[in-house]
From Swiss-Prot:
Assembly: Monomer.
Predominant location category: cytoplasm
General function of this protein: Transfers and isomerizes the ribose moiety from AdoMet to the 7-aminomethyl group of 7-deazaguanine (preQ1-tRNA) to give epoxyqueuosine (oQ-tRNA).
Cellular location(s): Cytoplasm
Gene Ontology cellular component list: cytoplasm
Catalytic activity: 7-aminomethyl-7-carbaguanosine(34) in tRNA + S-adenosyl-L-methionine = epoxyqueuosine(34) in tRNA + adenine + L-methionine + 2 H(+)
EC annotation from Swiss-Prot or TrEMBL: 2.4.99.17
Gene3D superfamilies named among the record's database cross-references: QueA-like
Name this protein carries in UniProt: S-adenosylmethionine:tRNA ribosyltransferase-isomerase
NCBIfam families: PRK00147.1 (NF001140), queA (TIGR00113)
Family membership noted in the UniProt record: Belongs to the QueA family.
HAMAP family assigned to the protein according to its UniProt record, in alphabetical order: QueA (MF_00113)
Pfam families the record matches: Queuosine_synth
């Protein structure tokens, strides 16, 4: 499909730079294909679901993966920024470097040059490989938990570009850009639909008889990359590491067997569950990388509803929601949201999408 089919105009003032407080007071647009749009709030979610339904959350935890450093080469020193993307070993991370032209394979980078240091003093890495679009493989001098502590000391929360270009990261973001149930460290970006949940809302969901299940997909920096291709068939997704346990897979299959619905909180949860589900509609345990790219025409295997924020034009995430609820429906929903003052992107409002195709197990 042509990428320009997923374009739309978004006024800059619709981009949220801070979340609402309390978190669950964000607006929630209920989208049912063929039905009028309904304005609600996130705290209404328990009333929009049924006992026996199941919510699937991504429990990944954002790490301070934005690193500032100096590339050291004999007779030449240059400032370099690195956004860690995906861990591939105890001492190895794939990362996006800027400006990429200043770096070549074999270069050494010392991070924490701006007065910040880890408890060992410095955090150093070697550029082992360099690929396209500024992607590189960094091999750090530290490893394992020691490396994790060093990154936490010298790194910054990697706010999305549409926020970072408007204001610097601050201490509030360390709390705001993290879900209340985050447990598994490794994400470069937050699973932002989950930012709306509070402990009180989670308790109300349980009291309503709605199940809560957790999976892990470590969101990578590739989620911020623009689609440069003119056709969706020419776009390559970056892989992300995820895990679905046997217990969670069995529980979700049981939900469908008794007639309940699976509601994914965020596109990351959806992409992982769909990756773990066979053409027979059975969710299976999963551990590894997924680069699933969902566009209109995809037949959903497991997920019945999706709660998600409002996404960028021409993005892979807007393509995904268009596959889920229909391209025309989503263009209409976004036009409605823009006119009605909804706030967009990571710190913005949310939508609850019902699927255009209710034939659950077709693939």
């Amino acid at each position: 499909m042509r990428v320009d089919l997923f374009d739309f105009d978004l006024p800059e003032e619709r981009i949220a730079l801070r979340p609402v407080e309390p978190r669950d007071h964000a607006k929630l647009l209920h989208v049912r294909p063929g039905e009028p749009f309904e304005d609600r709030h996130v705290y209404d979610l328990p009333d929009l679901l049924q006992p026996g339904d199941a919510l699937v959350f991504n429990d990944t935890k954002v790490i301070p993966a934005q690193l500032e450093g100096m590339r050291e080469r004999t007779g030449n020193i240059s400032q370099v920024s690195a956004t860690l993307h995906m861990r591939v070993g105890p001492d190895r991370w794939k990362a996006f470097l800027r400006p990429a032209k200043r770096v070549k394979e074999g270069d050494r980078i010392r991070f924490g040059h701006s007065g910040t240091s880890c408890f060992l003093g410095t955090l150093d890495a070697t550029v082992a490989e360099k690929g396209d679009s500024g992607e590189a493989l960094l091999v750090f001098d530290l490893s394992g938990a020691v490396l994790d502590e060093a990154i936490a000391a010298v790194g910054h929360i990697p706010l999305p570009p549409y926020i970072a270009s408007k204001r610097p990261e601050d201490e509030r973001d360390r709390k705001d850009y993290q879900t209340v149930y985050a447990r598994e460290e490794g994400a470069v970006a937050a699973p932002t639909a989950g930012l709306h949940f509070t402990p009180d809302l989670l308790e109300k969901i349980k009291a309503r008889g709605i199940e809560e299940h957790f999976v892990t997909l470590h969101v990578g920096a590739g989620t911020f990359l623009p689609v440069k291709a003119d056709d969706t068939g020419d776009h390559k997704m970056h892989a992300e590491i995820g895990h679905v346990s046997q217990r969670t897979a069995s529980a979700l299959n049981a939900v469908h067997e008794r007639g309940g619905r699976i509601i994914c909180v965020g596109t990351t949860s959806l992409r992982l569950i769909e990756s773990a589900t066979g053409e027979d509609g059975v969710v299976r345990p999963w551990s590894g990388a997924t680069d699933i790219f969902i566009t209109p025409g995809y037949r959903f295997r497991a997920v019945d509803l999706l709660m998600t924020n409002f996404h960028l034009p021409r993005s892979t995430l807007f393509m995904l929601v268009s596959a889920f609820s229909g391209l025309d429906t989503m263009h209409a929903a976004y036009n409605y949201a823009i006119a009605d003052g909804y706030r967009f992107y990571s710190y913005g409002d949310a939508s609850l999408l019902e699927r255009i195709d209710h034939d659950r197990h077709s693939a």
